[in-house]
Amino acid sequence: MAAILSAVALAGCEEKKTGGEAEGKYETLKLKYEGSVGTVTYPELAQDLGYLDPIKLEWIGNTISGPASIQNAATGETDFGGAFNGAIAKLIASGAPLKSVIGYYGSDEDTYMGYYVLDGSPIKNAKDLIGKKVGMNTMGAHSEFILKEYLKQNGLTEDEIKQVTLVVVPPVNTEQALRQKQIDVAVLSGMLRDRALDNGGITKLFSDYDLFGSFTAGSLVFTERFIKENPNTVKKFVEATAKAIEWTRTTPKEEVIARFESIIEKRGRKEDTETIKYWKSPGIAEKGGYIKESEFKVWVDWLEKGGEFKNGQVKLDDLYTNEFNPYKQEIENK
């Protein structure tokens, strides 16, 4: 963590383009970011729909880890990143000067994170997970938080929870790892989950939707310095991303999928578009990715109860802002 914060300090010393160096009213016309294999992020969709013009995204690679994504934003390797809200709270609490600006993924009845076992598995409940391996995309983020909450709600002690082994598996390999019995439980979400279900032979043990209902789970972040120096660019980015989220909500599913397939094919990263056809919904609870205080509070409270945060160590207002969201007034005036 010290290395990350040291890099944050160095990133803060870098010069950023000012208004005079960028065209028009935007402080910078280029935003560095990481993508995700075989999927389309909302900023990428916003760019393709023309909502982000004249600002352009500069892809520097892919990530499968939310914590790594926001660390890269904190150190200046990228201009923005995204992660589970609990992971964002932990990094900000450690001293990283980040601010969440818009929700970008979550769970609803169609789009959720499920924990799956093979048909016929002896694992039927939380107690059965003791001594077993659970495969997930990264540690310290959504998958781990939800699993531990499930175990706690079902009466496991801290010592018993420690006996459940977490194994990092790239999302595209998780289904295969389960079927080959390299893991006992697979954490699957979105299109990869639906493809695995289509292939048959797996059963849901539980899901985050079962525990919490519909909720926005993760946010996109910028550093506070970037926001201060590039407020018009950040405002345009949030507006464009919010509009892209709502475009997927109001556009026929087939049209959304076709657009995603087109974006993946055009960018030429040698990706499989097969899983995109399983897209169902944005999974974001509030209009335009508006962030509700409760979507951070639940995880801050959880971390305080677990002893990772001291009571009052993290102020919710320090974690996020809705000031750039075009739907802010509409939502708050309801």
Regions found by a protein language model. Give the residues of each.
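Short, low-complexity disordered leader/linker segments with a strong preference
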Residues: 1-30, 329-334
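Short, glycine-/small- and polar/acidic-enriched structural segments
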Residues: 21-157, 163-167, 214
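Stable alpha-helical elements in mature extracytoplasmic
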Residues: 39-42, 65, 69, 84-87, ...
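Short, solvent-exposed loop/beta-turn-alpha elements that line the ligand-binding surface or hinge
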Residues: 54, 107-108, 210-212, 281-292
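A ligand-binding cleft/hinge motif common to bilobed small-molecule-binding domains
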Residues: 85-95, 147-148, 184-202, 302
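Pocket-lining segment of extracytoplasmic ligand-binding domains
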Residues: 167, 172-263
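Secondary-structure end/capping motifs
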Residues: 228-310
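Conserved C-terminal helix/tail region of periplasmic/extracytoplasmic solute-binding proteins
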Residues: 297-334
